[in-house]
């Protein structure tokens, strides 16, 4: 039994090239564009715009002076 040759001949297995791994994946190929977050970049409008100083009504001031 040790002398009996292997029935399976050492025939070279034809390596058929797999086409799917060779072609590059398109999603992996193209670089992902890093879109910058707009919310932190754009300044908050409420602190940015200066608060308009309301002009003092003269009648209110006059009333205060009159009361004194």
Swiss-Prot record:
Ranges of biased composition (kind: Polar residues): 59-68
Coiled-coil stretches: none
Annotated segments matching region Disordered: 1-68
Tissue: Developing endosperm.
Composition-biased stretches (Pro residues): 1-24, 33-55
GO molecular function, one term: nutrient reservoir activity
Disulfide pattern: none
The entry's keywords: Seed storage protein, Storage protein
Job of this protein: Sulfur-poor seed storage protein.
Name used for this protein in its record: C-hordein
Organism, scientific name: Hordeum vulgare
Taxonomic lineage of the native organism: Eukaryota, Viridiplantae, Streptophyta, Embryophyta, Tracheophyta
């Amino acid at each position: 039994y040790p002398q009996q040759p292997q029935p399976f001949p050492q025939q070279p297995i034809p390596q058929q090239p797999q086409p799917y791994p060779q072609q590059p994946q398109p999603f992996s190929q193209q670089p992902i564009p890093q879109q910058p977050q707009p919310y932190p970049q754009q300044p908050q409008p409420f602190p940015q715009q200066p608060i308009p100083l309301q002009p003092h009504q003269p009648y209110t001031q006059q009333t205060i002076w009159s009361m004194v």
